[in-house]
């Protein structure tokens, strides 16, 4: 745990006592802050009380006596409208921050020069974050991995010199971290997502920009217009920018040509690594993820040789284009993390004949952008609330059925793929949708897919059944 000593003796209000919120409350108490916490869920309040954390309905407190208000990242700060606790804090002139900001302030006090790599973007954050941490760990460096990837940042070990922090940051977390200042900050890409929480694409982009604007080295993917503008703007403001691209040659930075990652500097380009044969980094999207990871590791002093070794031994992540089973000539792939069309595109681009399970809670734009990839789809099996919308988009271009539920989709797709004599058939869950209409999160959806694949007769599993690997 990182005790938040920079708030010792100060009164801090906190809302949100879920996983990271409870960790934050503990860290503030351990650092000597006087914490008053609350949550809309009485069970969460009771759990905090059982640990000796002071709780009170934040409607009733005297806000003028508090120095700061810490908000859990899952609670609306601005859109669709501010949470009532945010309104109360702002009315009293109390700053509203999150756990990433608390980490930043502790680092600033105790180890301001310890390497801190922060990663954001619409797609690819978790893979890039895990890849950077793996390269650092495999090269023998003291590495702490946390943030949006699943481990609360304040549950990590305290900052000290030569301890490396690799932190995945969601837009919600950045919004609550006004002084974020990583050694190396990564913005992978920007496409419409979470607009229910940010209102407009411009506000979403502005929030993401904060992470790289405060970085020692800003690593920015320039394959979309919003990110390109951000790279140009922060460079004019004096930030050192490394551009990365999976589509085009860049004059300064890293870019991909097929499976090769090249570094451009001073008018010349040199080969850094060839990803060919690294199954966990298959596809052009992973070329971008690898380029970003390489740039970040170079920025914090990792050698090219250490980076190459780490790339080759990367085990990959669950729910991300993950082969989970094989039966006959059919491979079953779990890509449950693909919660929008842009995230599904890399997997659809990586295989030639796909029995595609898609659907769930649809995002803005649906799957229209995937139409160039429709020829790769042998048949689609549509589930969840998006089924009718996706069926209308597929029209006569792709055979489809409305399966409704994941279990039916797996059974029907497996049967159809088995009848197809084409080599290299793939049954793939790559939903292009959020999971919340049928599952609590994409992980549970992916684990359900794996369990249902494991239940098919004659299946050779490539991961532990029901656990997604």
Swiss-Prot record:
<dbReference type="GO" id="GO:0005737">
    <property type="term" value="C:cytoplasm"/>
</dbReference>
<keyword id="KW-0067">ATP-binding</keyword>
<dbReference type="GO" id="GO:0005524">
    <property type="term" value="F:ATP binding"/>
</dbReference>
<comment type="similarity">
    <text>Belongs to the MurCDEF family.</text>
</comment>
<keyword id="KW-0573">Peptidoglycan synthesis</keyword>
<dbReference type="GO" id="GO:0008360">
    <property type="term" value="P:regulation of cell shape"/>
</dbReference>
<dbReference type="GO" id="GO:0004326">
    <property type="term" value="F:tetrahydrofolylpolyglutamate synthase activity"/>
</dbReference>
<dbReference type="Pfam" id="PF02875">
    <property type="entry name" value="Mur_ligase_C"/>
</dbReference>
<dbReference type="GO" id="GO:0009252">
    <property type="term" value="P:peptidoglycan biosynthetic process"/>
</dbReference>
<keyword id="KW-0436">Ligase</keyword>
<keyword id="KW-0961">Cell wall biogenesis/degradation</keyword>
<dbReference type="InterPro" id="IPR018109">
    <property type="entry name" value="Folylpolyglutamate_synth_CS"/>
</dbReference>
<keyword id="KW-0547">Nucleotide-binding</keyword>
<dbReference type="GO" id="GO:0008764">
    <property type="term" value="F:UDP-N-acetylmuramoylalanine-D-glutamate ligase activity"/>
</dbReference>
<comment type="function">
    <text>Cell wall formation. Catalyzes the addition of glutamate to the nucleotide precursor UDP-N-acetylmuramoyl-L-alanine (UMA).</text>
</comment>
<keyword id="KW-0133">Cell shape</keyword>
<protein>
    <recommendedName>
        <fullName>UDP-N-acetylmuramoylalanine--D-glutamate ligase</fullName>
        <ecNumber>6.3.2.9</ecNumber>
    </recommendedName>
</protein>
<feature type="binding site">
    <location>
        <begin position="121"/>
        <end position="127"/>
    </location>
    <ligand>
        <name>ATP</name>
    </ligand>
</feature>
<dbReference type="InterPro" id="IPR036565">
    <property type="entry name" value="Mur-like_cat_sf"/>
</dbReference>
<dbReference type="GO" id="GO:0051301">
    <property type="term" value="P:cell division"/>
</dbReference>
<dbReference type="Pfam" id="PF08245">
    <property type="entry name" value="Mur_ligase_M"/>
</dbReference>
<dbReference type="GO" id="GO:0071555">
    <property type="term" value="P:cell wall organization"/>
</dbReference>
<keyword id="KW-0132">Cell division</keyword>
<dbReference type="InterPro" id="IPR004101">
    <property type="entry name" value="Mur_ligase_C"/>
</dbReference>
<dbReference type="InterPro" id="IPR005762">
    <property type="entry name" value="MurD"/>
</dbReference>
<dbReference type="InterPro" id="IPR036615">
    <property type="entry name" value="Mur_ligase_C_dom_sf"/>
</dbReference>
<keyword id="KW-0963">Cytoplasm</keyword>
<comment type="pathway">
    <text>Cell wall biogenesis; peptidoglycan biosynthesis.</text>
</comment>
<dbReference type="InterPro" id="IPR013221">
    <property type="entry name" value="Mur_ligase_cen"/>
</dbReference>
<keyword id="KW-0131">Cell cycle</keyword>
